[in-house]
Design a protein with these regions (language model features):
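Intrinsically disordered, low-complexity regions
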Residues: 1-6, 34-35, 40, 62-65, ...
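Juxtamembrane helix-loop transition sites at the ends of transmembrane segments
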Residues: 31, 49, 95, 101, ...
Length: 157
């Protein structure tokens, strides 16, 4: 019987761009959680956070070598881009899209499904927990070291 696993991913950003969090929850076919991981980062947009969550999840699932991996996300944009229905136009998403394509290669079979936010509660909770950590770190920076402008890194004076 093939090993079927389910990967739930979610990303969140405050400020769009702003502090961000990404999370992934890997479950077996019985719905039992095998692994979960979250990461705080930023500045990032919501869409970047969603892709970062998928990267995190694929890296987490790869060593377990499932025969079938079903990815579930509430990001319709990401699902449609990965299905080839939408082009990836945003410059900040292109490298993440390419990275996801590379990470998908070793998997035998991958399905990517759009689900409603309520069905992604565990990944959503972890992503928001990571977002809170990113906000805390951002709040602890001195004002002169905080991010400056859209998509820029840090400016130190």
């Amino acid at each position: 019987m093939p090993r079927h696993m389910f990967l739930y991913v979610d990303g969140a950003a405050a400020g769009n761009p702003g502090p961000a969090g990404a999370a992934a929850v890997l479950k077996d076919a019985d719905g039992d959680t095998l692994l979960e991981k979250a990461r705080a980062f930023g500045p990032a947009t919501n869409n970047v956070a969603e892709y970062q969550a998928l990267v995190l999840g694929l890296e987490m699932a790869a060593p377990l070598q499932p025969d079938i991996l079903t990815v579930r996300t509430d990001s319709e944009l990401m699902v449609r881009q990965l299905a080839g229905q939408y082009k990836v136009r945003a410059p900040n998403l292109k490298p993440l899209y390419r990275k996801v394509q590379r990470l998908l290669e070793p998997f035998k079979s991958v399905e990517i499904e759009h689900i409603q936010r309520g069905k992604n509660a565990e990944a959503d909770r972890l992503a928001h927990k990571a977002l809170q950590e990113a906000r805390r770190v951002d709040a602890e920076l001195p004002p002169t070291a905080r991010r400056s402008g859209r998509g820029k890194k840090f400016r130190l004076k």
